[in-house]
Swiss-Prot record:
InterPro entries: 2-oxoA_DH_lipoyl-BS (IPR003016), Biotin_lipoyl (IPR000089), GCV_H (IPR002930), GCV_H/Fam206 (IPR033753), GCV_H_sub (IPR017453), Single_hybrid_motif (IPR011053). The glycine cleavage system catalyzes the degradation of glycine. The H protein shuttles the methylamine group of glycine from the P protein to the T protein. One of its GO terms (biological process) is glycine decarboxylation via glycine cleavage system. It comes from Chlorobium limicola (strain DSM 245 / NBRC 103803 / 6330). It comes from the Bacteria. The gene is gcvH. Gene3D superfamilies: 2.40.50.100. Belongs to the GcvH family. The glycine cleavage system is composed of four proteins: P, T, L and H. The modification N6-lipoyllysine is found at residue 65. This is Glycine cleavage system H protein. Its cofactor is (R)-lipoate. Pfam families: GCV_H (PF01597).
Length: 127
């Protein structure tokens, strides 16, 4: 199970990666989440310009087995939705790379400190 050390994680199995400018970040689902969901067939996300509160639902992932809500790790505004998700299987194939979901402008970058680091996420999923 891949759990990169340079990301932050939520208890809902989303990851967030702060981008170089420090005010924007990419958000996706973890390798653990995509593995548990199985083959992802459709991703529905709120559009760019949507303002989000931390823990607010920003979309859904539909897999063969189930449908799961996606929760914003921090408050912010969706700047971009990943256009590659028309081929939803990219989330299974590369959850930390090409399978990212949204790019958000973060209201408070310090709020990332409240999220789990890689070691805490490993503990959460029992690795």
């Amino acid at each position: 199970m891949s759990i990169p050390d340079d990301l932050r994680y939520t208890k809902d199995h989303e990851w967030i990666k702060l981008l170089e400018d420090g005010s924007a970040a990419l958000v996706g689902i973890t390798d653990f989440a995509q593995s548990e969901l199985g083959d992802i067939v459709f991703v529905e996300l709120k559009p760019a310009g949507t303002k989000l509160k931390a823990h607010e639902v920003f979309g859904t992932v539909e897999a063969v087995k189930t449908v799961a809500d996606l929760f914003a790790p921090v408050a912010g505004e969706i700047m971009e939705v990943n256009g590659s998700l028309d081929a939803a299987e990219v989330v299974n194939q590369d959850p930390y790379g090409e399978g990212w979901l949204v790019k958000i402008r973060i209201d408070d970058p310090a709020s990332l400190a409240e999220l789990l680091d890689a070691a805490a996420y490993r503990e959460l999923i029992g690795e």
